[in-house]
Each structure stands twice: as structure tokens, then as C-alpha cells.
Amino acid sequence: MIKLIRFFRSRRCWVISLQARCFSAPSRTHFDFSGESSDTERALVSALGSCASSNDVTCGRQIHCRVLKSGLDSNGYICNSVLNMYAKCRLLADAESVFRDHAKLDSASFNIMVDGYVRSRRLWDALKLFDVMPERSCVSYTTLIKGYAQNNQWSEAMELFREMRNLGIMLNEVTLATVISACSHLGGIWDCRMLQSLAIKLKLEGRVFVSTNLLHMYCLCLCLKDARKLFDEMPERNLVTWNVMLNGYSKAGLIEQAEELFDQITEKDIVSWGTMIDGCLRKNQLDEALVYYTEMLRCGMKPSEVMMVDLLSASARSVGSSKGLQLHGTIVKRGFDCYDFLQATIIHFYAVSNDIKLALQQFEASVKDHIASRNALIAGFVKNGMVEQAREVFDQTHDKDIFSWNAMISGYAQSLSPQLALHLFREMISSSQVKPDAITMVSVFSAISSLGSLEEGKRAHDYLNFSTIPPNDNLTAAIIDMYAKCGSIETALNIFHQTKNISSSTISPWNAIICGSATHGHAKLALDLYSDLQSLPIKPNSITFVGVLSACCHAGLVELGKTYFESMKSDHGIEPDIKHYGCMVDLLGKAGRLEEAKEMIKKMPVKADVMIWGMLLSASRTHGNVEIAELAATELAAIDPSHGGCKVMLSNVYADAGRWEDVALVREEMRTRDVEWSRAFSGVV
């Protein structure tokens, strides 16, 4: 015994007392000291538990050797302790060896091994062992439920929980908290309320661990009234509880309620401040987020890398903001610029701010081998129309990931180089270990839409159907848009109807089919689809109304178009932009209501562009209005003096009116100024 004590002390793994801090919760479950164990057993079990907690494999192996030499491996408690040590340290080959040679396997042995498999994310092995267990307890079921939850198999976790309940196995607070977490990801409100009722029935609702998970569940399911009611009724709250409720308001966009709750937190931590900053950024309130950030610094809190990434990314989205430069200075001052992802974010910030030189300088000063920085530079070049430079960086990147390929393929698709986008896509699927994802396919279908090649579109669609890429609304919208732009509106409509009741929870697929139908002259179909949309809890957006107004324009439905235009702001809170005004000018102009079209242009919040004045000029010629034609031509020439199309159109207006002297003057002016002739204008759609 004295030699054993000296050995443990020499390895610094001797634990003098058997206090609870020496063991994790599972250890207390596995081992029972009722006074029958000898001091040697206690010492060994305690030391092995300490090794498991501290992940001290070297010391654990040495103790295992001493156990074998002493012949104590026949002792069930000690053997389970050795098994637990290897399982906790994720040395499953050693754990399996001990398990096979175990002389006295019991339910604790099986539970330890199942827990080891779950910790190492070997769920299949855990399931196989679970199925052959001679006796399953609450610990067995709880461990496997945790395994399902870790692998995002929420439905399976709930199913196993129901099996456990049907067998009459009593659950504990760990089981219930784990199941509540799984249920929160499934989003079923009735299951949520059932679990809360169960917690009350088992008198576990007062446990902070359980009640906090219940609160988190309601927040994830966006049942914030239930969440707040539970929060107010909780007998005990900790900072985690406050932060969960705060995060629920923040994620739901309820900033005022979040602010009110935030002010009530007496001891805020970095999570509390970060939640408020994140909530403001989600609402595009950068200035408010920076106020919280500044106040946080005054309270002595240090920002995290993730927080700085979020703030700088938001600054990049805020056009004309100088906040990003100040944040960059703070990042350098605090030494955050050595973090790889912050370096990539800084590159992205300058690229989006159209300062590609500074982005390139930041890249040169960063760790060039870091893939995120290279991807940021590729995307930056693409954003600034420098596709060749982007390709150069792409070709020099040896460890390309999915973001590298997506940035480059998207760059070609956006820069009107669809053939190059498709060529790179074929290279990706034939020679790269990186496989396309949904974002890749969106860019591919966009490129095919530009080409108008139905054959290419069908090939890409076939590839998608045989792949493992999960569908989403944006991908569905891209497919619908591709078929519509390639002239196969029936196929686009079939795909829309096949998917709208299965996965469509956003506006994207609706926009694709409405705009596609309108573009190809199916105005009634587009407007009928919009009517169907209004009966659903899906909100239209700016793009939706471009399609709707285009449909009205094609069908000559002036009054209906005006009604929809006015409803944008009054009914949906959408401010019309230049595309919507362009649709209305085109609609009014084609109907011969040129004065109204002119007044519409005057009311625009932004200056009319070449397209809008061109449409008014074209409509003026169609309806023989020389005065408005002269106005449109003058405005058009002021925007683009080198564009000869307006002069040609104006001379044709004069010719139609028989004003041949004016025709001669316009033609002479064109020859004098060497203005290029442009023969045509096209409408918005």
C-alpha cells in the first residue's frame, strides 16, 4: 500500500480525498463506494478518475499497468475505472480491448462504452452496443439521446425518448434537458408544451438547467410570449437564463424588448453585450451596435474576435460609412489583426468599399497561405470587376475549398462570361475533390440563364437530381428562372408547383415564376400567381413588384398597375426604387399617358437614368408628342452626351411631325459632334 501511494505521488496523480470535484457526474454514477472497497481500490479508482478528468493519458496508462501487475483487473470497480479513463480520453481501441477482457461486465461497463462511442461521434457503434445491452437504464437512454442530438438527428432523439417513456424508465433532469434541446430544433410547439408539462409533473421545472433549456426551446420556436411567461415564473435565474431570453428577443428582431431586458441585467458578460450588438446588426442598425460596443469597452469588457468580424462586416455593408476604418484601427491597436479570419474580413471590407488597393495591401501583409484571406481577395476582385486578377489568385491557390470555387464561378456568371463559368464548373466536378453545393449550382443556373441554352440547363438539372445537394428555396428559384429565361415556361411552372408546397417558405421561388411569366408575356399567369401569393404568410419584396408591374405593362393594365404601385408602400412598407418607377413610366408611356409619365419621373426619389428617359422618348415618338420627346432627348443627352440614340430618335420624331428643318439641324449636330449612332431602346423587362 505504501509503495502504491509513493508511486501515485511521484506521478502527481494521487488524489488525497474522495471529494466530488475529483469526479465528473458520470463517474459518480458508475462507481459506488459503500465501505466495502479497500483503500487500494479507492486510491486506484480515484486516481483513474482524476486522469480521465484531466485527460492525462500517460499517467492513466501507467496506473493501468500497475493494475495488471497487481492482478486487480479482476476487480469490477477498478476495471470499470480503467475503461472509463480510456473512453473519456477517447482512446477507443484501448477501451474496446479492456471491454473485451473485462471479467465482470455489468450495466455500468456498457454505459461507459456507449458514452465513449458517443463522445467520439461513433454513433453507429454506440447504437450496436446499445442494442445488445442486457439491461438499459436512464443513463443508457440519456447517453444515446445525447448522441443523436450531437449528430443533429433530432427526430431520432425524440423517438428514443418516447420509447424510454413507454418502457416506464424514470428520467432525470439531464435526460429531460437533452430532449428539450432536441425538441427545440424540431420546432413543434405542441411537443414543447408537452415537455414543459412533463417537467412540471416530475417536479423538475424548478431546476435551472431544465428551465433554461425550456426557455431556449420556446425562443428557438419563436414562441416568445410563452418564453417570457416561463422566464417571469422561474423561481431561480442565472446569467445564462437572462442571456437566453435576451437572445430570443434579439433573433426575433424585437430590439425594444431586448433593450428593456438588457437594462435589467445587473452583471452583464460578453455574451450579453454581444447579443445586443448582434441584434442591432440584424436590423442593419450599425450606429446603435457601435454605441453598445463603446459602452461595453467602458465597462472594461474586451471584444471577441467574432464580435469584431461581425462589426467590420456590417461596416462593409454600410455604404459610405467611415466606421469600418475606425474599427480597423481598433483591431490593430488590440492586436486582433493577427487572427486569420479577421484578416480576411479586413480584406473583404476594403474590397466591398471599392478600395481594392488597400485590400491587396492587407492581403500582402497577412498570412497569404490562409485560405479565407485568399477567398476574400478573389471575391474582392470579382466585386470590383477584376475577374482576370481574381482568376490569377484562384489559380495560385493550392488548397481551394468550396468558397474558392463558388467565388470564381459566381464571378464569371456575374461578369457576363457564362461560358467560362460553365467551363470552371465542369473542371470542378471532373478534377477537384471539392464537390459543388447549392450556392455553386445557383451560379451555374444563373450562367445558363444568360446563355439561354435549354440543353445546358437540362444537363445541369440532371446533375443536380443525381447529386446529394439538398434543395433550398434559392436553388429552386434559380432553376425556375433558368427554365423561364430559356423559353420553357411550362417546365418552370411545373417545377414551381412541385416544390411550392414542400419547401417554399420564402419569396424567392415566387419571384422567379412571377418575373419569368411576366417577361415571356404571360401577364395573366403572373398576376394570378401574385394573387395566390397574397393568401399565404409569405411577404412580397421589391423583386416581386418588378414582376407584377412588368406583367401590367405587358398587358396594358394601367389602373391595376397604379394600384399595385401605390400598395407597395401603403400595404407592404416597400419603398419603390428606380426599377419600379421605370416599369410605371413604361406602362404609362405605352398607354399614351405621357404627361403622367413625365410627372412620375419628377416624383422619383433618385434621378432618372438613360433607360427611363429612353422609354419616355420612345413612347413620345409612338404617340407623336414632340414637346415631351424634346424634353426626354435633352435629359438623355445630359446624362450621356456620347450616346447618339436619343438624337436619332428625336430626328425621327421631327420627321414624323414633318419638321424637316429640325431633322436637318439634329443630323448636322450629330455629324459635328461625331456622336455614335445607337439604333434601339429596350424596356425594363
Swiss-Prot record:
| PPR repeat copies, ranges | 40-74, 75-105, 106-136, 137-171, 172-206, 207-237, 238-268, 269-303, 304-338, 339-369, 370-400, 401-435, 437-471, 472-502, 506-540, 541-576, 577-607
Is Mitochondrion among the key words of this record? yes
Which residues constitute the organelle targeting sequence? 1-23
Transmembrane domains' residue ranges: none
The cellular location(s) given in this protein's UniProt record come to: Mitochondrion
- What are the entry keywords? Mitochondrion, Repeat, Transit peptide
Segments of this protein annotated with the region Type E motif? 612-685
Chief location bin:
mitochondrion
Q: Name one GO cellular component term.
A: mitochondrion
InterPro entries referenced in this protein's UniProt entry, alphabetically: E_motif, Pentatricopeptide_rpt, PPR_At4g14850-like_plant, TPR-like_helical_dom_sf
PROSITE patterns per record: PPR
A Gene Ontology biological process in which this protein takes part is:
mitochondrial mRNA modification
| Gene Ontology terms for molecular function | RNA binding
PANTHER family documented for this protein: (WILD MALAYSIAN BANANA) HYPOTHETICAL PROTEIN, PENTATRICOPEPTIDE REPEAT-CONTAINING PROTEIN
Q: Which family does it belong to?
A: Belongs to the PPR family. PCMP-E subfamily.
Name of the protein in its database record: Pentatricopeptide repeat-containing protein At5g19020, mitochondrial
Q: Which organism is it from?
A: Arabidopsis thaliana
